[in-house]
């Protein structure tokens, strides 16, 4: 509860922060000790000769720059589509994170302990859902086509985004009246409370599905490509799409803040919703194009095999 204190008179949030800092420092010292022990006891015993070390040094390539990554991605339409998938995912997740944390701060009403408890619960639920989806992910990829499996993540985001953005916009419009959104089992549910809950599960499911579905389908898209594009393309996509995805959402918010200097993050929700619609359109455009390209490669390979057999 807000303002609650421990027996020693220290604020509860401050005390929990001290505990977390102690855990982080202890874990860091443990990692340092483990790293030192591996270098002293394990690595010297490995039977690696000078030729193997030299070959490893040759195989290790330099990470491409942002401009080099863009140039390489533009050479292949498949890589461009994969980079667009990574970019769209990163931007949308950034929108959701910023808006959800803003709604959570309003819902917590300045209670830092409640905010911290929600974030801890969010991490726990995300981990549980990730474990479940990692187990079920293989079955999903076997039972459905590549396009169907790859489209599950954006479809989930679209369905939940309608509720999420809608509740925030409605809550901002009816903030002065203070009217609840609806009543469930005698309990009045406000628009902020609904946005917090929808954003909670939306973020947890989407972030968990990244490891089990999004990354898996993305890696499958590299399979039909030739070896050079496959090896260099992964690094280029990670640099171009990954970095742009992380910074794209922040760039959008910065531009909107410049255009509307007195606007709050909540008041910018309609503009972010419109931007999300545009991003989802690009996402599905890239999925359709990539799906056609993958199936064209597969059909061509099957035709070659049939001709060879004939």
Task: Cite the ranges covered by each PLM segment.
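Lipid-exposed faces of alpha-helical membrane segments in multi-pass integral membrane proteins
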Residues: 19-33, 84, 88, 125, ...
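C-terminal ends and interior cores of transmembrane alpha-helices
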Residues: 155-192
């Amino acid at each position: 509860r807000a303002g609650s204190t421990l027996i020693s008179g220290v604020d509860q949030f401050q005390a929990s922060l001290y505990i977390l800092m102690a855990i982080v420092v202890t874990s860091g010292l443990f990692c340092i000790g483990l790293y030192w022990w591996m270098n002293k006891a394990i690595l010297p015993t490995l039977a690696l000769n000078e030729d193997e070390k030299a070959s490893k040094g040759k195989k290790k390539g330099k990470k491409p720059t942002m401009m080099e990554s863009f140039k390489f991605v533009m050479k292949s339409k498949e890589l461009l589509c994969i980079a667009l998938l990574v970019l769209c995912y990163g931007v949308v997740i950034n929108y959701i994170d910023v808006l959800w944390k803003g709604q959570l701060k309003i819902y917590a009403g300045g209670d830092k302990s409640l905010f911290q408890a929600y974030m801890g619960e969010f991490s726990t639920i995300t981990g549980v859902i990730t474990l479940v989806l990692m187990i079920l992910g293989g079955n999903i990829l076997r039972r459905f086509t590549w396009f169907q499996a790859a489209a599950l993540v954006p479809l989930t985001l679209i369905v939940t985004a309608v509720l999420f953005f809608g509740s925030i916009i409605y809550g901002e419009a009816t903030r002065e009246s203070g009217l609840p959104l609806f009543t469930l089992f005698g309990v009045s549910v406000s628009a902020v409370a609904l946005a917090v809950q929808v954003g909670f599960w939306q973020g947890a499911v989407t972030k968990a599905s990244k490891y089990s579905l999004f990354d898996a389908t993305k890696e499958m898209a590299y399979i039909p490509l030739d070896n050079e594009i496959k090896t260099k393309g992964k690094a280029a996509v990670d640099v171009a799409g990954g970095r742009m995805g992380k910074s794209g959402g922040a760039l959008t918010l910065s531009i909107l803040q410049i255009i509307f200097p007195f606007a709050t993050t909540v008041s910018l929700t309609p503009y972010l919703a419109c931007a999300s619609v545009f991003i989802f359109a690009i996402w599905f455009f890239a999925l359709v194009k990539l799906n056609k390209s993958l199936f064209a490669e597969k059909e061509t390979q099957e035709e070659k095999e049939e001709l060879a057999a004939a």
